[in-house]
């Protein structure tokens, strides 16, 4: 039996990969363990480890990295705790592969620890660009430590190969999240209202994270957004979902809570992925800078008002409206999203991240990988036409 460890650090990433984990758990020749860290272990972000426990996965390791303060220095301390904890863990626990998704700093620490113990890494969602965040260089660094790559578009597959990864180790399966939006059983509006209260006919969902490399302060970023939303306070309802634990997220959390209290809008620290998708499905659109607005929401035929540069560089479909972090621009974006012509565009648009059978293909590729001899040295793949000659 082959052993795989999946390490999860956030509610969003776990929601994307949960169906994959379920299918791997049900595969007879695989023993699947989970290690839980990051936001899952913090009350300020919903203590979402309970969701994983309810799903009955075998949690073999829990690492609380203390992320209730989000300065650059504190995040570096959290990364150090994570690196040391998983370094010790891998000294006493061997796996045929460690699987991770995305680009968060705690996952970076896990990837380093696994690599130093010569455990093959499987990386999901590599090759993507997010230019206004340190996620950008973290993601590409994880790619260089990984031996199997499951990308979400053909463009990202090419970029992973451009980083020197062998083409035979890189597979474009599409996004599991884009497939989830169409395949998961989503609650209906009445079921949502039993959990979260009455949903008005005209409401937006808002998810806003810090731009960690921006020259604009987090204070200014969130102030511009809230000023724009207040413009619609008499015509629309707004449901805010808590932000990721990035540098400055505690500032966003504090200001959003105060804003919601003042205008009687709802603030939810965290919700299950099915509820999140359903809440957006019945809404007027998603406002903010979450990657879900580009990857999952287009499958629901709902508009995304994507704010700022957090997602700059990512592939996007016609349902996405890009605006800078500036009040008047955000107001214009919200108004465009409600225009009948644009709604028609959204309804007829396709999701560039969707590819049929993403889940089935992911399981097949992972099974083939762990059965193969993957302990060989990683070689750097030189793209022939990019090799410089000095002759």
UniProtKB/Swiss-Prot annotation:
GO terms for molecular function: hydrolase activity, hydrolyzing O-glycosyl compounds. Pfam families: Epimerase_2. It comes from the Bacteria. GO terms for biological process: carbohydrate metabolic process; UDP-N-acetylglucosamine metabolic process. Gene3D superfamilies: Glycogen Phosphorylase B. InterPro entries: UDP-GlcNAc_Epase, UDP_GlcNAc_Epimerase_2_dom, WecB-like. Disulfide bonds: none annotated. On the 2D-gel the determined pI of this protein is 7.38. NCBIfam families: NeuC_NnaA (TIGR03568). May be involved in the synthesis of polysialic acid (PSA). This is Polysialic acid biosynthesis protein P7. It comes from Escherichia coli. The lineage of its organism: Bacteria, Pseudomonadati, Pseudomonadota, Gammaproteobacteria, Enterobacterales. The gene is neuC.
